[in-house]
Amino acid sequence: MNVKRKILKNGSSFVSAVLAMGMFVQQVSAKTPADTLVMAWNLDTISTFDPAQINDRYGNEVLVNVCDNLVVSATDDAAKMVPSLAKSWDVSSDDQSTVITFHLRDGLKFNDGRPANANDLIWSMKRVVQLKMATAATFNEYGITEQNVDEAFQAPDDKTVVMKFDKPYPAELILSHFATSRTLALLDRETLMKHEKNGDMGNRYLASHSACVGPYQLESWRPGEGILLRASSNYWGEAPKLKKILIRHVAEPGTQRLLLQKHDIDVARNLMPEDLADLQATTDIKVERVLEPSVIIWGFNVTNPIFANEKVRLAMRYLIDYEGLGKTLLKDVGIPRASFIPLGNLGALDEKEGQPFKLDLPKAKQLLTEAGYPDGFEASIFAGASPYPFALPIAQSLQDNAKKVGVRFKIERFVGTQLFSKLSARTFDTIFFGWNNDSADPHTMASRLIYNPDNRFEAKNTGYASWCHGYLDETMNQKVQDALFQKDPKKRAQMYADLQREFMQKGPYAFIYQTYHTIAMTPDVKKWVWNSAPRIFYSAIEK
């Protein structure tokens, strides 16, 4: 069977569904529809479009283009917050609290034309807290819980939303964190409650639907096949430049490359570095790249007695050939980095100090002996080609180096959703995963990677990587809080620098590299709009 025929066959049911909706998607011709952006992307990790539950960057990218937020990062400056659902806001604060009052713009409507107001948004925000799923942590870390949510979120009228915080949290941090969060989506309460099952407030419905105010609506989602977004006819803002966004699930980079070369798609999202270099040198394909605030991590489960030992965790860092990886596998993919704060964020250690480790097998052996494992041990590494395509070859490199000091790693491969399930259930020894900073402020990394509000298994704090790894250090918790409330910018930056130096020696992770976000596209894409968050603005993309 030739490749084209295979591609068409594998996506036939999704294509049929798209055709049934009246959309013409060319699978084998040289042009995609002028009003449609067609992307190829590995969508293995997406399991829901519920703002209360979604916890993967792929689904999040789609959701923030379907559901508007109160505020959003500017297209040309990720650190600048600009109005969205809110046309303006006021901040009042003292030594005890912070209050932010948002004034909603006129003309907000759901996709079917019904008006949306502040009470709908308050319900949506409370829903996140009450469902106690992954993104509840976004509110919890600012002191908003099920016990005080009615007082914290209020709507004095249809156009006003008031958020009250019981500590003097920096308003700029809250705004930048919430700007990239899914938690401030204005949901369609009427639709969701019609589809409520056993008190889930529409959670199961949102596994395959959207119901919110935004420029696009989710027309179709077929796991393993693709996503179709259609522009909303009742959107309050400027109409999207393109009427439809079709995201095809294409797992293999080689297949994505073939589709892109033939112009059967407009954009490829998962190409390998060698493919990108070759395409740039030999074709008309354009490549866009930005260093993103995202890190790839090798995590250690501290509930496992072996990895509860700090010296074992430190020994693992000396098994990583940072220099070799940087020159080969990670070239044009990312920057080797052992710090939890990405380059570009406040207080981030520079490139040299942020990566002090090197491959040192004698040092690793010494630490293992001091930890009580002179003959090594057996453990597993969980990794997957999706959504981290370089995790498997890095894991294999680690496996080879570990053998030389007596550590016997078994590599187990999983697809994205399985990998996240293992992470959330703490059912792993070591695991590869990624973490993206939700703002330009380092607290949003420290608050999830270091801080742990409750390490009990029954707490199910799956929004915290620290909890997923069973890591709780009360001293480090306090240092995270102290840095958060430090008002002097220079002192605050120094506190984060010190926190990085300490955490890279004792934390439950070995940070591997900070990633580049790289996208390849045909010349048909005339305007690609994103910032360094990176936030991609589907509605502003032009062909």
Question: Which sequence ranges carry the predicted segments?
Answer:
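Ligand-site clamp/hinge motif
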Residues: 204-207, 232-278, 408-410
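Structural transition elements
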Residues: 335-370, 387-393
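Ligand/substrate-recognition segments at binding pockets and active sites
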Residues: 39, 222-225, 369-439, 489, ...
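N-terminal lobe/hinge region of extracytoplasmic solute-binding protein
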Residues: 40-93, 126, 209-215
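Gly/Pro-rich hinge or "lid" segments in bacterial periplasmic/extracellular proteins
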Residues: 74-76, 179-240, 244, 362, ...
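Long beta-strand-rich cores associated with HINT superfamily self-processing modules
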Residues: 458, 519-543
